[in-house]
Amino acid sequence: MQVTVETTEGLERHLTITVPAANIENAVTAELKKIAKNRRFDGFRPGKAPMKMVARMFGGSVRQDILGEVMQRHFIEAIVKEKINPAGAPTFTPVDIAEGKDLVFKASFEVFPEIVLAGLDQIAVEKPAVEVKDEDVTNMLDTLRKQQATWSDVDAAAEADSRVTIDFIGSIDGEEFEGGKAEGFALAMGQNRMIPGFEDSIVGKKAGEEFTLEVTFPEEYHAENLKGKAASFAITLHKVEAQELPELTEEFIAKFGVLDGSIEGLKTEVRKNMERELKQAVKGRIKEQVLDGLVEQNDINVPAALIDQEINVLRQQAAQRFGGDAKNTPELPRELFEEQAKRRVVVGLLIGEVIKTEELKADEDRVKAIITEMASAYEDPTEVVSYYEQNEKMMSNMRNVALEEQAIDALLAKAQVTEKEVGFNDLMNQPAA
């Protein structure tokens, strides 16, 4: 076997591989003999059919199969010999496949980029300094009560936290516009669902009133035809409701799994959950900044084959989220996933290089800690831990999670880290970058 390596611009590689004709012909002959021995032919006893007849009937298809197998096998031998690491499946192009002549074919593929990590000491990380305070727990209790709240009609003017039922018709320059009309619309005030000024104009009005309000759509409004436009809304207020929050009774508290029914018990459980969520949020915020810095400091070429693979994964996940079957769901445009897919591939390659450079191995104690922490959110943590420990595939996934955490820790040790005090709600409500 002869191999010629052609290095093109970027990550593309071409191998021209030559396989002696004798290798092909011997393999074809051996396969035809198997067919002659094992297949029944009319007019001939088993194994007695003439080879010429067998070759005439099956020679073409057998040769095609053999060529495919030979190209695949010799490609693998070639990349091992040349110490090449392909990033995806090759494309084979026959150059000379004439019978009786040496097989010559070209294999085209991409390789993984050679990565030399740089700028790790330039990664800037702002570590949130935050804790769950008593007032945060109190606010969370109020949130839980609001989730269980009821509404009742009141004969009073609407307030900033009322729920109102309205009809409205919107118009611009006297003309109604699409999406600007509704009947029996229930609006919980104070949640910023409407454009600025809309809810303010309802405050102080009572059921049965009809009025007109003047507002201006924000410049950043999602509908292009409404951005920055002045509009009028004719409103009929049908109903005003006030929110009634449940008391912190034993019955209410029991809904959250606090068996002793005490307020202190509920506070303890709520604080525990908040601290668990906070820990994950802090970890996630730090990880996000570390990865952003790593990508910013290391501009690498990315194999298109890996991006294509990741796009397919994201497509399947999207189909599942929408409750569909990937096979029966129309293929979503690759443009929807391309940027995210490339980011994932870049991060994966760079983290892989960190693991290699730092010679990291999954810390089994960390693996156990990750599983234990995750299991603590379930009713029976011991059962969850046992389930993971008995499933090798899931344990392998957890080892990968631990390994990634160790890589983040290694990068964090080299990064420029500062601390910034932040409130619980500010951190938890901070949008992802």
Curated annotation (Swiss-Prot):
Locations listed in the record: Cytoplasm
Major localization class: cytoplasm
EC primary class: isomerase
Residue intervals passing through the bilayer: none
GO molecular function, one term: peptidyl-prolyl cis-trans isomerase activity
Reactions catalysed, as given in the entry: [protein]-peptidylproline (omega=180) = [protein]-peptidylproline (omega=0)
Pfam family, one: Trigger_C
EC number in record: 5.2.1.8
Coiled coil region boundaries: none
Domain comment as written in the entry: Consists of 3 domains; the N-terminus binds the ribosome, the middle domain has PPIase activity, while the C-terminus has intrinsic chaperone activity on its own.
Family: Belongs to the FKBP-type PPIase family. Tig subfamily.
Protein name, entry field: Trigger factor
Protein's organism: Photobacterium profundum (strain SS9)
